[in-house]
């Protein structure tokens, strides 16, 4: 590793890239201060043989300020405190990784701090058997890079190599991955390479880590294409390898790649994909551009990412079922939108968007369905609502089941948001734990203005209210388990060669020898096939269908043809 420190038989070698500094000293707490040697690229290096695991350190800069290591492996006292030397040793018995094929992926997105009452890696470990029984094949963990305080979504992280101290630190995360692997569950880590958080970022004093040309609304964005960008790219790519080698993660979710601007001949996303694929892992991107370039192979000038999120799919179902038309939902709302998303993935694939006031997106062509991840809830779509309401609070139970079937039985990769599978009713708010009064006030006002959030993001109550209650609705949980089982048994993944028909309030999807029937309001449907009932959301559906007309109540049914 180029950045941070390295332990070997000669001692500990520290390496800091800080070209803005003329001199840097290493301060080992309670041991001493040592002058570091600078090379012509701005790297400061020193090897010490009197340093051991558990020692804490900072760097002293030209102005005598002390800063933590930007590649710190652990920040036991938070983003402003000393960095700590940790041992990479761990007794792994997980056989290194779980290799899950895209067509077998059923993802479960969770936030460590609110998934259990403990809010720790250990708390998640206690629920792994439950997740295995649910039928998911991978857990996707929201960012765990060290952020300010003890409560945050994770997207305000500032130490990309340091595991959040309040969650259980690096040893706790290693244990979680190890235990997940023993049950055959893959671990996908959500990482943020489009920006760093607004508090605790000392890299600005060290070198050109951040772009002077591009901005994000969340914090400074990394410099991937200007002077000094070679070292910044290395900093990011080594971070990818770090999570794979040191923590055995099986894949990554890249946050908001539309906010990663890189005009280099080779885009950083392609570089990231190359590193991930070198280790036979997977990488998934969040993008709101509706651009197949993200997942297209290199021979089609793509970045070769394995899959990308599809917000259009969510918006179509949400707007149709709830009737909401505010904000971006104004572009959606008809049953035809659901049909188009089933057929073409993106609804806006070169169409004019009234919300954006421009043409948006591009056709995905014949890319297979497992290049795309769909959902009816996620941390953004729930947490960026003013009241943090989950879908279960916005629609009736039958509509909720219809929504679940629409995405779990789709040809795309389904992603469940924690608690959704049993009808969790607690809200999921945005919360933070900053210490800067001006920043705190800015966040409060911004969330109120942009999202209508009246709850205080800094309040412990907001955080605690967002924790799962684990009050399980057995009927909904059983339905989710059945959907996941059917998806696997009937091989419904990836194949986009479907026959989709619809009326004003109903939709049928035929493929893989099955017919899925979705009835949004009592309707008469003329069936063109004969089949046997496999699963239904209620008892109103006939056990057998033939080529005739049926008056069906609201709900969902799947028939084997």
Swiss-Prot record:
Any Pfam family matching the protein: Alpha-amylase
pH dependence: Optimum pH is 5.0.
Subcellular location: Cytoplasm
EC number, as in UniProt: 3.2.1.141
Disulfide bonds listed in the record: none
Thermal activity characteristics from the UniProt entry: Optimum temperature is 85 degrees Celsius.
Name listed for the protein in its UniProt record: Malto-oligosyltrehalose trehalohydrolase
Residue numbers marked as site, Transition state stabilizer: 380
């Amino acid at each position: 590793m180029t950045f941070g420190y390295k332990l070997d038989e000669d001692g500990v070698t520290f390496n800091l890239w800080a070209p803005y500094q003329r001199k840097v000293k290493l301060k080992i707490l309670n041991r001493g201060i040592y002058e570091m040697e600078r090379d012509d690229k701005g790297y400061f290096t020193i090897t010490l043989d009197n340093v051991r695991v558990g020692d804490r350190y900072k760097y002293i800069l030209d102005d005598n300020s002390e800063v933590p290591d930007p590649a710190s492996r652990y920040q036991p006292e938070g983003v402003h405190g000393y960095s700590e030397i940790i041992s990479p040793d761990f007794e792994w018995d997980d056989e290194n990784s779980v290799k899950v094929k895209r067509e077998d992926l059923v993802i479960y997105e969770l936030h460590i701090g609110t998934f259990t009452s403990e809010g720790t890696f250990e708390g998640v470990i206690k629920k792994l058997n439950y997740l295995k029984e649910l039928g998911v094949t991978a857990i996707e963990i929201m960012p765990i890079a060290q952020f300010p305080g003890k409560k945050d979504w994770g997207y305000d992280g500032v130490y990309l190599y340091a595991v959040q101290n309040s969650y259980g630190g690096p040893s706790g995360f290693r244990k979680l991955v190890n235990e997940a692997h023993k049950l055959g569950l893959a671990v996908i880590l959500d990482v943020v390479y489009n920006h760093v958080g607004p508090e605790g970022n000392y890299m600005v004093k060290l070198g050109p880590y951040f772009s002077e040309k591009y901005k994000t609304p969340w914090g400074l964005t990394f410099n991937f294409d200007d002077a000094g960008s070679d070292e910044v790219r290395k900093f990011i790519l080594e971070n990818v390898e770090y999570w794979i080698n040191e923590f055995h993660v099986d894949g990554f979710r890249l946050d908001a790649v539309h906010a990663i601007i890189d005009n280099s001949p080779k885009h950083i996303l392609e570089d990231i994909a190359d590193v991930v694929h070198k280790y036979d892992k997977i990488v998934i991107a969040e993008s709101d551009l509706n651009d197949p370039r993200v997942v297209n192979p290199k021979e089609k000038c793509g970045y070769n990412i394995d899959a990308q999120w599809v917000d259009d799919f969510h918006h179509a179902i949400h707007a149709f079922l709830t009737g909401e038309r505010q904000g971006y939902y104004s572009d959606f709302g008809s049953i035809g939108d659901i049909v188009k998303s089933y057929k073409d993935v993106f609804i806006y694939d070169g169409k004019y968007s009234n919300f954006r006031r421009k043409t948006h997106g591009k056709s995905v062509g014949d890319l297979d369905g497992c290049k795309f991840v769909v959902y009816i809830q996620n941390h953004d779509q729930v947490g960026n609502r003013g009241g943090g309401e989950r879908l279960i609070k916005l629609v009736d139970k039958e509509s909720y089941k219809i929504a679940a079937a629409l995405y779990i039985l789709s040809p795309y990769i389904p992603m469940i948001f924690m608690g959704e599978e049993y009808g969790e009713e607690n809200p999921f708010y945005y919360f933070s734990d900053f210490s800067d009064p001006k920043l705190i006030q800015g966040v409060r006002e911004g969330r109120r203005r942009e999202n209508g959030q009246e709850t205080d993001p800094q309040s412990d109550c907001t955080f605690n209210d967002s924790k799962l209650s684990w009050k399980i609705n057995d009927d909904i949980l059983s339905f989710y388990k059945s959907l996941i089982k059917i998806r696997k048994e009937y091989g419904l993944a990836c194949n986009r060669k479907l026959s989709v028909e619809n009326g004003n309030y109903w939709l049928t999807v035929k493929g893989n020898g099955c017919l899925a029937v979705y009835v949004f309001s009592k309707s008469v449907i003329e069936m063109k096939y004969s089949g046997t009932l496999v699963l239904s959301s209620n008892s109103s559906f006939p056990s057998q269908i033939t080529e005739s007309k049926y008056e069906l109540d609201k709900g969902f049914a799947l028939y084997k043809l």
